[in-house]
């Protein structure tokens, strides 16, 4: 190993030494130019970042429970007092944050016969005002009630806590708690 690389490895922070070692740069010797080292570090870190981002998107899909069938959801939603429709064309909905389908609301369950864009940590809220943007959601969140977790991205059923009085609210919202992203909403009264 060249004396230049030895000196750099001693001076460098631990993380940089680990990256240099992991890339095999130390074994290559002095023939490698500094620009090439930086290029390799940047490209490898970029690929790693892409992999983590892809994992964040795919992991919820892989660990999601099996969704209920349309017949099962229809049976549960037969006692619904209200219904609404999730649509893809809301202001803050996009190709990664959307929902579509029939939402049925009863004092026991809120169901969706349809699908949501996959993502982590989805929560179902009720609001006294219609919401279709992250700004509106954050502004009104203190007046909303959390119903529960949405665990599937197709045909979900969420149990409604007994202390929630449905006529007080008029909008059902799916929100990604981890990333603070609006997914979808529908006004049911």
Regions found by a protein language model. Give the residues of each.
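An anionic, turn-rich surface loop/hairpin at beta-sheet edges
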Residues: 134-162
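Short, surface-exposed binding/anchoring microloops in extracellular/periplasmic proteins
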Residues: 102-121
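Beta-strand signatures of extracellular beta-sandwich domains
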Residues: 123-125
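Transition segment at domain starts
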Residues: 57-107, 138-142
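Short, exposed beta-strand-loop hairpins at the edges of beta-sheets
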Residues: 161-184
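N-terminal targeting leaders characterized by basic, low-complexity, disordered sequences
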Residues: 1-9
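Hydrophobic membrane-insertion alpha-helices, especially the h-region
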Residues: 39-57
């Amino acid at each position: 190993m060249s004396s230049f690389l030895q000196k750099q490895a001693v001076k460098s922070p631990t993380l940089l030494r680990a990256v240099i070692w992991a890339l095999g740069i130390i074994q290559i010797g002095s023939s490698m130019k500094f620009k090439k080292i930086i290029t390799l570090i940047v490209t490898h870190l970029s690929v790693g970042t892409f992999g983590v981002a892809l994992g964040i998107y795919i992991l919820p899909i892989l660990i999601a429970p099996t969704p209920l069938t349309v017949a099962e959801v229809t049976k549960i939603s037969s006692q619904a007092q209200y219904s609404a429709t999730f649509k893809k064309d809301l202001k803050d909905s996009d190709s990664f944050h959307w929902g579509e389908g029939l939402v049925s609301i009863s004092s026991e369950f809120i169901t969706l016969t349809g699908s949501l864009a996959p993502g982590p940590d989805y929560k179902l809220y009720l609001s006294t005002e219609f919401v279709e943007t992250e700004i509106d959601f954050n502004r009104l969140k203190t007046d909303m009630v959390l119903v529960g977790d949405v665990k599937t991205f197709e045909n979900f059923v969420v149990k409604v806590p007994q202390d929630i009085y449905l006529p007080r609210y008029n909008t059902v919202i799916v929100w990604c708690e981890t990333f603070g992203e609006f997914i979808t909403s529908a006004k049911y009264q």
